[in-house]
């Protein structure tokens, strides 16, 4: 049986994915680990706002949040998702290839 005590002992992305028995591609996790965990962390915070959930309901909601976070990065990437501030700011010192023209 999965418990919040067991859940709170988990450390890395693979631990969470294995705990919830979510099949995963190691390469996808290696490339997007921090982004997956950041999105999952937001999902956990949303679940925790609902204080009326039972332990089982929380675990189920956490699993859904992790599945969603992982699946997002199967079809997308960090630049598209803009999870971290570095991807949210437009850098002024960058010239895009589309802005270069040949005369």
UniProtKB/Swiss-Prot annotation:
InterPro entries attached to this UniProt entry: NifW
Signal peptide: none
Alphabetized Pfam families for the sequence: NifW
Cysteine disulfide partners in this protein: none
Transmembrane stretches, start-end: none
Entry keywords, A to Z: Nitrogen fixation
Subunit structure, interactors included: Homotrimer; associates with NifD.
Cited function: May protect the nitrogenase Fe-Mo protein from oxidative damage.
Sequence similarity: Belongs to the NifW family.
Protein name, as recorded: Nitrogenase-stabilizing/protective protein NifW
